[in-house]
Curated annotation (Swiss-Prot):
SMART domains: EFG_C (SM00838), EFG_IV (SM00889). PROSITE patterns: G_TR_1, G_TR_2. One of its GO terms (molecular function) is GTPase activity. One of its GO terms (biological process) is ribosome disassembly. This is Elongation factor G 2.
């Protein structure tokens, strides 16, 4: 069991990267060198500790965020190893929301890849300090300097090398520490556990000196004491450099860069030193902010004696317990048996067991204190993004935003007996994964499951069949289209109906107008209480939003519109929330149906890496898919082709790219935006959906 540790000695970090950059392998080495595991697990052998799901072991990728805790030099490090595949980007988003620092892992050959950029943007959004680890220095084509330059150019970051590699590819022998001025060699016989300190090799002294001066010059811009010593040519102690570098890292001014080969057991211990030296403790992070029950801004500092506040950032159904809720405690102390309040749901929850996790293993603890991460058993009402707090000291912390799904498949039970089981299992998975949506096709009655990509849905179907033991039939993947409008239109909704001894009455006048792509739905109230009392406005907005779930064109959700409430009427005796909800629904449906509807489709950002001789074939193949080529970059002896392409054209793209390039190209893609489907294509899609 991990002993209680002072908050200044806690690090809550995530390990993040593009797929195949070596995140999980790096994490496995961290667990081994910190004594958390007693043998090294390997991704390629299917026995990595952090990849514990069966599908993770089969596919050799991380699918769900796995959490663990280890100790390094007296510091407790809570680690979340996250997926690198774009289909599971929601796992990264919700992990970053509760982390204080990030280790960004880059492949020394591939450098900054598409998902690296996505993760970096997500970390920027939450103002998270980070260190970088340039991994796979032993691979053919490894280039430390090029990777460093890519971090600066592609990520618009300010990287600063704190190490340089000794050799590369098969000759990679260790690293030179630019602060301590010595080389670290990692003993193969002890799987890198024994680290030998050596003098800087003679042939590297010139490069070492230049790299150290570059480090000091960058630091001098952010630390006056160091600048004075540097300009006066005084001796600068290691302690002064560590202090200045920590300050610049926490201020998001610099990113310390390490290097190594996790697979070859080289460079991981210095990276761990970097985590404790440069990444923040909960005390270094500003107090978490939220609003109280009256909407007044309040904050809570990381102090176990403060009033309790925590954020649930993930739910997981489990074969051992019904519901496992991952929580970051921001203030106060959470104890077994506590009664806490969920201000989002307006419900009280009783805390069952509290757990500290190590991948899929767990140990029971009596309490989770401010600044720490753990899991709770027994919550009945709480979902991802909810705040838990004390009822007498309520606070609602900022929740999380999750992307809309872009692809769906129809699913149906194999028999009547499986119907209930399928419904319950889908509900459990949807509770765990906010980017997974279950809906019903009103015309066909089919159940549609939607997610972030083909792999995402493949994994969910696999879990249904194997983990939940549901017998089901699955259709072919379908694109999740949306609808929007091209011009403004207004309409009136009147609901007048006798119910028993009284009448129901409500009148609403709405105007709908188009917004720019990505704007979502805006509702604006432009009436006064004489027309519609304030108590009914919530019902009007709900009626509008609910109705826009199904558009007039072919029933897809309507987006990128502003709905203005411009008029209405009520009766003192006969008006109700229900009546106003119905009248709003009538009005918005009328207005949208007359506003020149258009079909929107998901556009993907595509990156193809191909040998030079196949570039023309790859472009020709994309031209058949309505793709827009936006750039070509040289990557060593390869070409990087950048394009925007409709998702509907990308089914089976692996096969067509393999055919066009004789299997020598590969690609990655991620969601970019929704855009209007060309009229001729839209007509074909609409006819197909309507069965014409």
């Amino acid at each position: 069991m991990v002993a209680q540790i002072n908050l200044k000695d806690v690090r809550n970090i995530g390990i993040m990267a593009h797929i195949d950059a070596g995140k999980t392998t790096t994490t496995e080495r961290i667990l081994y060198y910190t004594g958390r595991s007693h043998k090294i697990g390997e991704v390629h052998d299917g026995n990595a500790v952090m990849d514990w799901m069966e599908q993770e072991q089969e596919r050799g990728i991380t699918i769900t965020s796995a959490a663990t805790t280890c100790i390094w030099k007296g510091k407790k490090i809570n680690i979340i190893d996250t997926p690198g595949h774009v289909d599971f980007t929601v796992e990264v988003e919700r992990s970053l929301r509760v982390l204080d620092g990030v280790v960004a892992v880059f492949c020394a050959v591939g450098g900054v890849e598409p998902q690296s950029e996505t993760v970096w943007r997500q970390a920027n959004k939450y103002f998270i300090p980070r260190v970088a680890f340039i991994n796979k220095m032993d691979r053919v084509g490894a280039d430390f300097d090029h990777c460093l330059a890519m971090i600066e150019k592609r990520l618009r970051a300010n990287p600063v090398a704190v190490q340089i590699p000794v050799g590369s590819e098969a000759e990679f022998a260790g690293v030179i520490d630019l602060i301590e001025g010595e080389m670290y060699a990692f003993d193969d016989a002890t799987l890198g556990q024994e680290v030998e300190r050596r003098e800087v090799p003679t042939e590297y002294k010139e490069r070492f000196t230049a790299a150290r001066i570059s480090l000091l010059e960058k630091l001098a811009d952010f630390d006056e004491e160091l600048m004075e010593k540097f300009l006066d040519d005084e001796l600068i102690s290691s302690a002064t450099i560590y202090k200045a570098l920590r300050k610049a890292t926490l201020a998001l001014e610099l990113v310390p860069v390490f290097c190594g080969s996790a697979f070859k057991n080289k460079g991981v211990q210095p990276l761990l030193d970097g985590v404790v030296n440069y990444l923040p403790s909960p005390l270094d992070v500003k107090p978490v902010e939220g609003v109280d029950k009256d909407g007044v801004e309040v904050s809570r500092k990381a102090d176990p004696s403060e009033k309790f506040a925590g954020l649930v950032f993930k739910l997981m159904s489990d074969s051992f317990v019904e519901n496992l809720a991952f929580i970051r405690v921001y203030s106060g102390t959470l104890k077994q048996g506590d009664k806490v309040f969920n201000p989002i749901k307006g419900k009280q929850e009783k805390i069952g067991k509290l757990l500290r996790l190590h991948a899929n293993k767990r140990e029971e603890v009596k309490e989770i204190v401010a600044g720490d991460i753990g899991a709770v058993v027994g919550l009945k009402f709480t979902t991802t993004g909810d705040t838990l707090c004390e009822k007498e000291a309520q606070i609602i912390l900022e929740s999380m935003e999750f992307p809309d799904p872009v692809i769906g498949v129809a699913i149906e039970p194999s028999s009547k007996a499986d119907e209930k089981k399928l419904t319950e299992s889908l509900a459990k998975i949807a509770l765990e994964d906010p980017s997974f949506v279950v809906s019903q096709n009103e015309d066909t009655g089919q159940t549609i499951i939607s997610g972030m990509g083909e792999l995402h849905l493949e994994i969910i179907v696999y879990r249904l069949l194997n983990e939940f033991k549901v017998a089901a039939r699955v259709g072919t993947p379908q694109v999740s289209y949306k609808e929007s409008i091209q011009r403004s239109h207004s309409a009136e909704g009147l609901f007048e109906q006798p119910t028993g001894s009284s009448n129901q009455f409500a009148k609403v006048v709405l105007e709908i107008e188009p917004l720019e792509r990505g704007a979502g739905i805006e509702f604006v109230c432009e009436v006064d209480e004489k027309q519609i009392p304030a108590e009914f406005l919530g019902a009007v907005e709900r009626g509008v939003v609910d109705s826009l779930d199904s558009g007039p064109l072919v029933g897809y959700p309507v987006t990128d519109v502003r709905v203005r409430l411009v008029g209405g009427a009520y009766h003192e005796e006969d008006s109700t929330e229900m009546a106003f909800g119905v009248s709003a629904s009538i009005a918005v449906r009328k207005a949208a149906s007359e506003a020149d509807s258009v079909l929107l489709e998901p556009i993907m950002s595509l990156e193809v890496i191909t040998p030079d001789e196949y570039l023309g074939d790859a472009i020709g193949d994309l031209n058949k898919k309505r793709a827009k080529v936006v750039g070509v970059e040289v990557e060593g002896d390869l070409q990087k082709l950048l394009a925007h392409v409709p998702l509907s054209e990308m089914f089976g793209y692996s096969t067509s790219l393999r055919s066009a390039t004789q299997g020598r190209a590969n690609f990655t893609m991620q969601f970019l935006a929704y855009d209007v489907v060309p009229a001729n294509k839209a007509e074909t899609i609409i006819k197909k959906i309507r069965g014409i």
